[in-house]
């Protein structure tokens, strides 16, 4: 039986699951979390379910135009959702929950195209299948309403960051180092929350590590630590017009992909693989630091989440880049604020499901450039 809510509870209060598979496409992060109006969210369980290489290959292939895309996308979506369901069952088991105790699952899907300038963003998913496999309400398709309102549909996490990480009197930056880097600027005194994508992060770092180490990522940044930053290559990478574009802006593998990197490398004589990795690490750090210097110069603290939070070489590079940019900010992970970095993105989509259930906006128009704040998502009942 569903748990009886206290008399002062909001009708949307309860336990939600959040699922996020990002641009690294290595697997899905999930959380089970209790939301109550006026209280901090309480995480009841977390899980990570990896993707088989065959699924990763299918998802990577869908990043670029190809033959028979509709069939390939549909099959990949079904395979993806079976892994989502495994994650949900693991969360349910770990937290000791019955299906009736779960209000809804908030699921992002897997981005395969992000072209808001053309009026669309595409996250492959099969929420109806997930509802069938879990017998829980599913809320999905969070980005398209923001795009329909003229926004970028990304980033969506800043509204959640403001709720959980904001602090009166202190300007903070939350930096997500996933496949793509993005920042949320939380003003300490008045002003609008802002946020946008800065550029590539693990998407290119992981690609290069896979190509030269045969491993899915550069464990602890050790590969990059063996190399030296190649300054002319770094300058060429930073010459990409996206870095100079003003916010609101968002990006993804449509731009920052292996073909982009190879085209840049073609202008240089042989560069040692470890030097390329060191340079890509510097690219991530410098592109983030420059945006912070330009848009949040008064920031005193940067809190990192995402997979890059586990890369000490990347975090040190970010500290160095901030000093070089004249920003005297400390760099820590969101664990310092009580939220493990690997949970943040999945928590954000559980929160978006909570907001949808309450029929409250999930975006920030000041972040995405939409015509206004909108209720995001679509419901697939169990």
UniProtKB/Swiss-Prot annotation:
Q: Which residues bind ATP?
A: 22-29
What's a single GO MF annotation on this record? phosphotransferase activity, alcohol group as acceptor
Q: Name one GO biological process term.
A: amino sugar metabolic process
Q: What is its EC number?
A: 2.7.1.170
The protein's UniProt keywords, in alphabetical order, are:
ATP-binding, Carbohydrate metabolism, Kinase, Nucleotide-binding, Transferase
Which leading EC class covers this enzyme?
transferase
Which Gene3D superfamilies does its entry note? 3.30.420.40
Q: Its catalytic activity?
A: 1,6-anhydro-N-acetyl-beta-muramate + ATP + H2O = N-acetyl-D-muramate 6-phosphate + ADP + H(+)
Q: Which cysteines form disulfides? A: none
- The protein's superkingdom reads Bacteria
Keyword Ribonucleoprotein listed? The answer is no
Q: Which pathway does this chain act in?
A: Amino-sugar metabolism; 1,6-anhydro-N-acetylmuramate degradation; Cell wall biogenesis; peptidoglycan recycling
Q: Please verify whether the record's keywords include Transferase.
A: yes
- Pfam families according to UniProt: AnmK (PF03702)
Q: Which family does it belong to?
A: Belongs to the anhydro-N-acetylmuramic acid kinase family.
Biological function: Catalyzes the specific phosphorylation of 1,6-anhydro-N-acetylmuramic acid (anhMurNAc) with the simultaneous cleavage of the 1,6-anhydro ring, generating MurNAc-6-P. Is required for the utilization of anhMurNAc either imported from the medium or derived from its own cell wall murein, and thus plays a role in cell wall recycling.
Its protein name is Anhydro-N-acetylmuramic acid kinase
Originating organism: Burkholderia lata (strain ATCC 17760 / DSM 23089 / LMG 22485 / NCIMB 9086 / R18194 / 383)
